[in-house]
C-alpha cells in the first residue's frame, strides 16, 4: 500500500506543479513563432485579417506567458523546499543553467513583451515586428537552457564529485550532453 509520507507528498506536489507548468511554456513557445508569422504576413500584405489574427492570439499568448511565469516560480521554489538535498548536491551545475535561462531568455522576453503587447499603435510597424521576433527568440533560448538542464539531469556528463558536491569540469559536455539533441529536436 502507498504511504503518504513527506517524501511521497513532495513528489506528488511536484508532479502536479510540473504537469500544470509544462502546458504554458509549450503553448507559449509555439504561439510566439506563430505570432511572428502572423505579423510578418500583415507587414507584407497589409491585410487586416492577419492583424486581427495576431491580436486574437496575442491575448492568449499573454495569458499563457503570465501563467507560465507564475507556475515556474512555484516550481523553482519547490526545488529549494522539497528537493533541497538535490539542490545542494547538484546546484553548482543546475543553478548556472537556470541562471542562464533567466539572464538570456526571460529578460529578453520580458524586455520586449511590453512593447509587443501595448505598442502596436505607438511604435513603427517594423519596430513592433522586431519586438515580436525578440520575444519569440527569447522563448526559444529559454527552451534551450531548460532542455539543457533537464537533459543533463537525465544523462549527466562533464563533472566530478568532490566532498559530496558536483563540481563542473566541462560546460560543453554538461550543456550538450548525450540526450540533449533528441530532447531539443
Set out the residue ranges of the language-model regions.
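Polytopic transmembrane helical bundles with strong interfacial aromatic enrichment
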Residues: 1-185
